[in-house]
Amino acid sequence: MGGMAEHTQLIDAINIRTAVRAYDDEPIDDDTARQLEMALQPINLLGDLNIQLVRDQPKVFAEANASGHLTNAANYLAIVGPANDEEAKERAGFYAERMVLTATLRGLGTLWVAGSWDKAEAAKHCRVTSGQELYLGVVIGHPKNHLDYQAKSYEELCEAQRTHRATKTYEQFTATMSDEGREAAPDWFKSGVEAAMKAPSAMNRPPITFSYNPADDTAAAHIDQSAEDEHHAFNDMGIAKLHFQIGAGQGQWDLLDGGLFIHK
């Protein structure tokens, strides 16, 4: 049984990440905060975003903490970017989820939040310049009983991920494809979809589907119109595309609905 030490890849993080709603009340220390902020710099640069780490603001989650929906939520990544910009919202999902996976490898828990926080209160504690908006947030902190969590092996954490929630099936994630098409798709596509199946969603219902086009050996991502999640669909698409890209191994996405993935 391998411990977590040798599991340093983003695909390892995908295999163990779960939505964490209960946290220990131990704060994120300055050293960890510094490391997270260092990891944020290139992400903000690449994504043209303004994602910020905010610590020790339990008031933002007062209602969710009081109702028991969350426990001890107090820190968050404020996902800030250009206002009214669908491409930027997708980039925010893609790059902020990279931070989520980085935090996962550090033993921290995370949860994407769109509804279960006081957004106006959250905005008070971060910089939102004119022309920018606070899209949504990611709760971050030490998972409840985090010493027990850290003592678990990679295999145990993978097993916990597998049984964490009912996920949509591979068929649902490739809804527009025929059985023959699924069968004929290359391994990199299947691995990409499997990684995307493990992606979180701001609204807890992934509205993204993938398809493979054998004619030019590309994949495409689509917003599932039946999911009725217009508001955060582009954010969720960015999250799912990052997972797909890591699972597929090599390649690059075009942005937006119907964007193509070219496998290298």
Where are these regions (language model features)?
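Acidic, surface-exposed loops and disordered segments
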Residues: M1-K264
